[in-house]
Amino acid sequence: MGEAQVYGLEITPHAVRSLKKLKRDRALLRRLDAAILSLAQEPRPPGCRKLPSRKFNNLYRLRVGDWRILYAIEEDRIVVIILDVRRRDQAYRDT
């Protein structure tokens, strides 16, 4: 049996700013961090959804409660790029 491929993780400055705004809600931040880290092992986990986008070929979203992690997968570089973390009502603008 072969080992599962581990993807690298990159996080955009915009996503970092979004996460910093949540620093008061430590429980939510822990859940989001765990979900982001799990994408390195499984970039297409159950419940993720591929989104249509003009900017990215492989744009996905992952639900974490009322929040959405928006990310792209670059298969040629074996990397997951965290683009943003948004509340559900804001998640699908400008993708």
Q: What would you call each of these model-derived segments?
A:
Residues 1-8, 20-21, 27-30, 64-67, ...:
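Enriched for short, Lys/Arg-rich terminal
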